[in-house]
Amino acid sequence: KAAEYPSVGNAIYSASKGAIISYAKCLAVELAPRQIRVNCICPAMIWTELILQGGLTKEEMEEAQLRYPLKRYGQPEDVANLALYLLSDAAAWMTGSAIDLTGGAQQ
C-alpha cells in the first residue's frame, strides 16, 4: 500500500514499491505470449519479527491492529495462501495485477 499511500519520511520506500508494481505489470505484458504470469501481492502489516523490532510496545501493537477492519494483523499464512492461489490453475487468466492484501484497510 505504500505505493498508493505514501507517508512522511518514506519517499524512497514508497517509490520502490511503485517501481516494483510497474515492473511486474511490464513483465506481465512481455511474458504473456509465453504463458508466464506475473502478479504482485501488496500486503499491509504482516505479523513477523519485523513488527516486533519496530519499537512499539506490546500494547501499542495490539491497539494498532484494531484499526484494521478484520481487527488483526495479517499472518504469513495469509500471504502464502494468496501466493498459492496465484500459482494455481484457478488464477490461470490473472496476470499484471497488483493485489491488495490488507485485512480491509484502505490506507
Which residue stretches match the model-derived regions?
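Active-site "substrate specificity/gating" loop of NAD(P)-dependent dehydrogenases
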Residues: 4-10, 32
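Short C-terminal tail/terminal secondary-structure segment
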Residues: 5, 84, 95-107
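Conserved catalytic loop/helix region of short-chain dehydrogenase/reductase
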Residues: 8-12, 26, 50
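Active-site helix of classical SDR
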Residues: 16, 24
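Short, flexible catalytic-loop segment of classical short-chain dehydrogenase/reductase
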Residues: 21, 42-53
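Alpha-helical segment proximal to the catalytic Tyr-Lys
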Residues: 29-33, 92
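Conserved SDR Rossmann-fold cofactor-binding beta-strand/turn motif
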Residues: 37-47, 87, 100-102
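A conserved structural motif in NAD(P)-dependent oxidoreductases
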Residues: 68-79
